[in-house]
Amino acid sequence: MAVSMADITKLRKMTGAGMMDCKNALTEAEGDFDKAMEIIRKKGQAVAAKRSDREASEGCVLAKTTGDFAVIIALKCETDFVAQNADFVKLTQDILDLAVANKCKTLDEVKALPMGNGTVQDAVTDRSGITGEKMELDGYMTVEGASTVVYNHMNRNGLCTIVAFNKAVEEGLAKQIAMQIAAMNPIAAVSYTHLRAHETG
């Protein structure tokens, strides 16, 4: 059957798949969008399975807080090109938003969250099939405190910090502390008095 450009474009917006993949899926599904989406999903799963033994050493790392609950998450891929892709970064952000909203404590909980027409894990697998690269959620940590602050360095997708305080802290000061930690990468924080006492013996 003939497939219109409007339908192809619509399916592409729904799935993120390439134009030709969308056209072929719609043709095979005889114009049924649900069936076409399932065809694209299965193709993505097959592509992801073939790449399961590859190394995913690049990716996107982002952090977010609700005030007393903060999360940092990493979605990994194979190349920096994909890591910098807007759709890949958006997927990471969307997963992070879901994890924070549901206050997930483990990565398994995150992967099982509903997302789109499936789960978070399904969405990652689908994106893997679209890009042709191995992708995996590989890092996840939560921090809780009376007050937490996060810092995403220049909104880039690699350098983030989370700082938790045992009482309310002025937001500007908290951000400055988080930025200094990102810049200096300290192994610990001690008071000036303690440091001077250690230096003088």
Pin down the residues of each PLM region.
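A short, hydrophobic C-terminal helix/tail in secreted or cell-surface proteins
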Residues: 197-201
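N-terminal assembly/interaction segments in proteins that build large macromolecular machines
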Residues: 2-196
